[in-house]
């Protein structure tokens, strides 16, 4: 069985906590979120994405950020996603969040160590239980 895993992040891997966030300072949290599903179920995720893009009259090539969604769009996304998850138990949403203030010094020295550790905690079991995995992380900014 082939498993598709899509990964995205919210926050950044910077460590400037002396300045306010987005005014020279880094995010205080880092979240990784993934959706894991059998290959044949990826079409259902694509339908949700297309529905949001169509509602906003936005081309698929332009990434849509949740911060750009209004309340009605967020409600539509949640409604469609909740319905999908209730009908397809083999589709999983997962997330992990770290409060960066409490990250140990070793992980602060090399941001990839923290990022990779979070991926391991989030996805290792799913990856090990799958014969084949297509791992599709979003490009990190």
Q: Residue spans of the language-model regions?
A:
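Phosphate-ester processing/binding pockets and catalytic centers
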Residues: 1-141
């Amino acid at each position: 069985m082939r498993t598709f895993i899509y990964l995205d992040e919210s926050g950044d891997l910077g460590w400037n906590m002396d300045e306010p966030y987005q005014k020279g300072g880094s995010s205080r949290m880092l979240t990784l979120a993934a959706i894991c599903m059998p290959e044949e179920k990826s079409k259902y995720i694509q339908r949700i994405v297309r529905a949001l893009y169509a509602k906003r009259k936005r081309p698929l090539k332009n990434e849509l950020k949740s911060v750009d969604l209004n309340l009605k769009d967020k409600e539509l996304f949640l409604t469609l996603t909740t319905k999908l998850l209730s009908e397809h138990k083999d589709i999983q949403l997962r997330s992990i969040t770290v409060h960066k203030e409490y990250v140990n010094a070793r992980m602060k020295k090399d941001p990839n160590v923290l990022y990779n550790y979070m991926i391991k905690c989030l996805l290792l079991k799913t990856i090990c239980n799958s014969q084949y995995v297509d791992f599709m992380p979003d490009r990190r900014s």
